[in-house]
Curated annotation (Swiss-Prot):
Keyword Nucleotide-binding: no
Subunit record text: F-type ATPases have 2 components, CF(1) - the catalytic core - and CF(0) - the membrane proton channel. CF(1) has five subunits: alpha(3), beta(3), gamma(1), delta(1), epsilon(1). CF(0) has three main subunits: a(1), b(2) and c(9-12). The alpha and beta chains form an alternating ring which encloses part of the gamma chain. CF(1) is attached to CF(0) by a central stalk formed by the gamma and epsilon chains, while a peripheral stalk is formed by the delta and b chains.
Regions that span the bilayer: 27-47, 85-105, 115-135, 141-161, 181-201, 223-243
Name assigned to this protein: ATP synthase subunit a
Organism annotation: Xanthobacter autotrophicus (strain ATCC BAA-1158 / Py2)
Length: 250
């Protein structure tokens, strides 16, 4: 049996839509799961907030807790003015969280294990920071790259560092989520092949497969924790970066 832990990330074309300028646009398994994840979030929130009561049920409690959790995160990171970005942060958090959790189900597809998806979300965040910063503050937004209280001879050097640091944000934001999801799913796949391979060796193999099996269970629990943690980290960093668009001064 050939172990191919990368096969689970393969993009498969289902329907060819159009060819524009030599670029083929297709409906793929990645698009299918992204539409499905958005549908899951939409229908859950619609169901949970339908017929709201003073004493909430489980679904309503989960929706309200999610709302308050992200709202507090945004207020703590960007102040009350940052609530203008609440829809963006909440949408990104729920999308990343549900994508990560759905990806743990066997024979599904993990969209956040693809760099193009995480990079698109990271560029959306940084693009929002830049556009909102210039719209609200004009050229004063450039003060974000000018540290206050530093000697004049160090200023050019520090401005370059600040610009490079700002431009590296979408890279680190996208790579962190992508790498964690990719590595975790590869590890799960490898240990799953160990279990199947050893179990096929007979009675002795069944005993040998016991340790990898329990390691898979432990890895699944760890991956579930990582899935939630990465969604939280992505949302926190998004809130912190958006704070720069509201308060660009150092």
């Amino acid at each position: 049996m050939t172990v191919d832990p990368i096969h689970q990330f393969e993009i498969k074309r289902y329907v060819d839509l159009l060819n524009f300028g030599g670029v083929q646009f297709s409906f793929t398994n990645a698009a299918l799961f992204m539409f499905g994840i958005v549908a899951i979030i939409f229908f859950f929130l619609t169901f949970a907030t339908r017929g709201r009561t003073l004493v909430p049920g489980r679904a309503q409690s989960a929706a309200e807790m999610s709302y308050e959790f992200i709202a507090k995160m945004v207020r703590d990171s960007a102040g009350s003015e940052g609530m203008v970005f609440f829809p963006l942060v909440f949408s990104l958090f729920t999308f990343v969280l549900v994508s990560n959790v759905v990806g743990l189900i066997p024979y599904t597809f993990t969209v956040t294990a693809h760099l193009i998806v995480t990079a698109a979300m990271a560029l959306l965040v940084i693009g929002t920071v830049i556009v909102y910063g210039f719209v609200r503050h004009g050229t004063h937004f450039l003060h974000l790259f000018v540290p206050s209280g530093v000697p004049a001879f160090l200023l050019p050097f520090l401005v370059v560092i600040e610009v490079v640091s700002f431009l590296s944000r979408p890279i680190s934001l996208s790579l962190r989520l992508f790498a964690n999801m990719l590595a975790g799913h590869i590890a799960l796949k490898v240990f799953a092949f160990f279990v199947v391979g050893l179990a096929s060796a007979g009675v002795v193999g069944w005993f040998g497969a016991t340790l990898p099996f329990f390691m898979i269970v432990a890895l699944y629990a760890l991956e579930l924790l990582v899935a939630m943690l990465q969604a939280y980290v992505f949302a926190v960093l998004t809130s912190i970066y958006l704070n720069d668009a509201i308060h660009p001064g150092h």
